[in-house]
Swiss-Prot record:
Keyword Lyase: yes
Single annotated GO MF: orotidine-5'-phosphate decarboxylase activity
Highest taxon of source: Bacteria
Xref: Gene3D superfamilies: Aldolase class I (3.20.20.70)
Organism: Caldanaerobacter subterraneus subsp. tengcongensis (strain DSM 15242 / JCM 11007 / NBRC 100824 / MB4)
Family membership: Belongs to the OMP decarboxylase family. Type 2 subfamily.
HAMAP family: OMPdecase_type2
Disulfide bonds: none
Active site: K106
Assigned EC number: 4.1.1.23
Entry protein name: Orotidine 5'-phosphate decarboxylase
Catalytic activity, as annotated: orotidine 5'-phosphate + H(+) = UMP + CO2
UniProt keyword terms in alphabetical order: Decarboxylase, Lyase, Pyrimidine biosynthesis
SMART domains: OMPdecase
Amino acid sequence: MFVDRLIESVKAKKTPVVVGLDPRIEMIPDFIKEEAFRRKGNGVEGIAEAMYLFNKGIIDAVYDLIPAVKIQVAFYEAYGIEGFKAFFRTAEYAKSLGLIVIADVKRGDIQDVAKMYSKAYLQNPLFDAITVNPYMGEDSMVPYLEDVEKFGKGIFVLVKTSNRSSKDVQDIETKKGGYVYQEVAKMISRLSKVIVGKYGYSSIGAVVGATYPFEAKILREEMPRCYFLVPGYGAQGATAEDVVNCFDEEGYGAIINSSRGVIYAYRSDFWKEAYSEYEYGQAAREEVILMTGMINNALVKRKYIAS
């Protein structure tokens, strides 16, 4: 079962940190682009090669530290078929090193179409879990739920996202007295009862933004069986203290994603004096170690205060 594998990897690595592989060609080190363009030319094939080589360097640097990577498909789709090849190659390489692979695809459509999305990703052995948009209702999620159970995969359903304007829709008050995001949470919590692993968590998880710690506390109570995928740490402004409400009392229940903050750490003010572009992987590794320490310390502090 996906969620059991995830929890066991989190325990083994002693970190909830997930690295997002969102390569932007303009931010990839020049030496990688030069090599990729030498091999494949400076068109889309060369760009896709540069993205893959960059990702491979990040994975090599952090795979022993983290339980999973999250690959955002949009950064690859932008380059057509060649971009998709880089997307799948990245997933394959991460899997070869024992990492859990989350495809951040945010799919959502009517049930008949959702079957095809689910076939494309949840029935693909390269991917362990995907992100899903629930806006079209419960029946649109049925194909994903069926494949989660049949193939031992997972989904993370968008509930309260990290972007600033998420409140425009997700915080609309309902006739029942709560907010839209709470109604989605209730639906996900109900669905999560069907597929529960040996640690008490479900393979039906939720996306809950680190930039909304107050709402995260509410949602942790609303969805006690749901593992949270938490974006918004680092580049979007959330801190270790902001994410603690996503965790249960034992320090589990959430994985915290950082994309730009890790993969472009070598360009940050904090690390750029210590690491050159040739050492981008080492900078990423140090950022993961720092992030892990900060989150774990924040969790210890919360537990101490609570006691």
